[in-house]
Amino acid sequence: MGLTQSAVSRQIAHLERFLGVHLFERIRRRVVLTDAGTTYATKIRSALDHAEAATLQVLASKSGEHVLHICSLVTFASHWLTPRLASFAKEHPDIALQISSYHHRSFDLVANDVDVAIHYGEPSWPDGLVDRLMEEEIVPACSPSYAKSIGLRSAKGLGRATLLQQTTRPDAWIDLLASLKCSDINALRGPRFALYSMLIEAAMAGLGIGAIPQFLIEDHLANGQLIRPFKGSVRSRYTYYLVYPEAKRQLREVKAFRTWILREARRENFKARKPST
């Protein structure tokens, strides 16, 4: 912010005098929020985020840039979207990207000042236009050392394996085991992870085997960090979509990103149509 600690302290003191309440208190050499401070911070955080975004847009526009705010599921952004963004930046050097994340539930695009979002689920979003991107191919994947440690060479061996679970996707193992004709195995046992990125790290560390979208782990499979210990896969129940507010559909930066990501998704779908093993 360009302010010294003492200057920040003075600003806080002015705000506390204006509000007539203490926002912070010292506890064992630590400065922590009071109950009033916590409530106040919660109430104004959204407004501050909007102010920050608006400020960045104004600063970017001074240099001739247009800001595109993309909101994505965390693992999709880190494992699929971000590695491809260099090509978008090369095509559109005047568009500055702002990437944020959300977890599974739809939200108000306009109220959150989001230009485009990546959605997994049904082809619907409140007050949003929807373009289909791609489906998932779910595959079993684990580290080579884990497969060796339990002698995992066929789907029947999953009965003695630790099944790594993605918290919001219990259908992944249910559907994969059904496709492998192993429905007698309990599909819901095993440690649970909030994000696929966490589950992938656990699989690479040898904690167990995951039912993972293949497009998220192609690099890990290629470099040998993960393997598919036996044949088999299943198409996921849902699909990834690009969503954006109707009021922003004609914005140049939105049109540019839509064209680009649909092209990238077509390439992914082409790879997915190849016979799986």
Where on the chain are the PLM-derived regions?
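Central regulatory/effector-binding core of bacterial HTH transcription factors
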Residues: E65-W125, K274-T277
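Hydrophobic hinge/microswitch elements
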Residues: I185-R228, R235-S236
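Short helix-loop hinge/linker segments at domain boundaries
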Residues: R28-V31, T38, D49-C71, R273
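Ligand-binding "clamshell"
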Residues: W125-V130, M134, H220-F230
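C-terminal effector-binding regulatory domain of bacterial HTH transcription factors
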Residues: D94, Q214-N223, K231-T277
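Acidic, Gly/Pro-rich loop/turn segments at junctions of secondary structure
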Residues: S100-L164, T168-R192
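Helix-turn-helix DNA-binding motif, specifically the short coil turn and the N-cap/start of the second
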Residues: L3-A7, Q11
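A short LG(V/I)-centered, amphipathic sequence patch enriched
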Residues: E16-L33, L226
